[in-house]
């Protein structure tokens, strides 16, 4: 009989969102008349920007002609998209990132997991707690952790608690680590990092020859012009950081799939024999071997994000969701609930009322208000007693959800 990857058996009972789905399905089966409002998983609800739709329609028409047909494209992404990304997302903010250092993909979740393919198994890993579950689970699947304890934490990982007590700012580890996962604006807490805070991480990484994996999937939601959008706005970050970004939330590409990873040339790791190896070459080889690239049609849609019309439409989308977040913050605060986040990110992180644990509050909202959110404990032990609500929904649904919660 074929053997399975035993590391998968170390995973906790269920990935957070499938467990939410299981409970919601059971509730809906028992209460088919219930009108659920989903403010849980961070999936967008508004239509794709017109500029992106027009570009994809045009690309489809091209594909219908012999002259305009495109088969396999470059695994790294088409040059015209990579150049637009480099110019508008990085160089415009003073980051020395070239088009060649950008790899277009079908999702930052995939990339933040797949990056482990080019990193050794003996690295000491640090994650915040609470944390986006994919960072932890992908390391478990790859055999980079020990077993999980009663508190849900895995052996072999360094956990960096973030809470209201420390302003949701992870403290620099007291011991050396090799791999650091940072996400700003943060999922799930909605917290942001200043340049000074990121500078401390870059200084630590350079001093300890560590690698920062920086998830900037929500950078478009930052409202304060003084806050950094990229780790590469920090001097020295090219020497110690890989950055992940996505078109999913700012441009509504959750269903069309397009993202990017930045691997600076000159960024190095260490081989078993002690020699230094450039990570760009390893990632390029990995993508060329295991990935066929994002479709031509989708990349044309992503390129349109950088057109004048696309920029305005994306800005309007972001503003719409941030207005939703402001409504959620205002209404929860008026109801006497302690709230965090939601000012530079599309997530509101609330303290569960009356000392309820996270999953009890989930069930309470589901059963009494027919509102679906995300239990904070699903993001880690330090998330117990917190709860995440997403601003990704229609205005009418957000208003109705808040009315239901107020009436509890």
UniProtKB/Swiss-Prot annotation:
Pathway terms, separated by semicolons: Amino-acid biosynthesis; L-lysine biosynthesis via DAP pathway; LL-2,6-diaminopimelate from (S)-tetrahydrodipicolinate (aminotransferase route): step 1/1
EC class: transferase
Residues bearing the modification N6-(pyridoxal phosphate)lysine: 249
Residue ranges that the Swiss-Prot or TrEMBL entry lists as coiled coil: none
Gene3D superfamilies in UniProt: Aspartate Aminotransferase, domain 1, Type I PLP-dependent aspartate aminotransferase-like (Major domain)
General function of this protein: Involved in the synthesis of meso-diaminopimelate (m-DAP or DL-DAP), required for both lysine and peptidoglycan biosynthesis. Catalyzes the direct conversion of tetrahydrodipicolinate to LL-diaminopimelate.
Gene Ontology biological process: lysine biosynthetic process via diaminopimelate, diaminopimelate-aminotransferase pathway
Protein's recorded name: LL-diaminopimelate aminotransferase
UniProt cross-references to CDD domains, sorted A to Z: AAT_like
EC number from the UniProt entry: 2.6.1.83
Any Pfam family hit: Aminotran_1_2
Annotated S-S bridges: none
InterPro entries for this protein: Aminotransferase_I/II_large, DapL/ALD1, PyrdxlP-dep_Trfase, PyrdxlP-dep_Trfase_major, PyrdxlP-dep_Trfase_small
Gene that encodes it: dapL
A GO molecular function held by the record: L,L-diaminopimelate aminotransferase activity
Keywords noted in UniProt: Aminotransferase, Pyridoxal phosphate, Transferase
Record: residues binding substrate: 15, 42, 109, 132, 187, 292, 388
Species: Synechococcus sp. (strain CC9311)
Subunit structure: Homodimer.
The keyword Disulfide bond appears for this protein: no
Binding of pyridoxal 5'-phosphate, residues: 72, 108-109, 132, 187, 218, 246-248, 257, 292
Catalyzed reactions per annotation: (2S,6S)-2,6-diaminopimelate + 2-oxoglutarate = (S)-2,3,4,5-tetrahydrodipicolinate + L-glutamate + H2O + H(+)
NCBIfam families: DAPAT_plant
Cofactor: pyridoxal 5'-phosphate
Family as reported in the entry's similarity comment: Belongs to the class-I pyridoxal-phosphate-dependent aminotransferase family. LL-diaminopimelate aminotransferase subfamily.
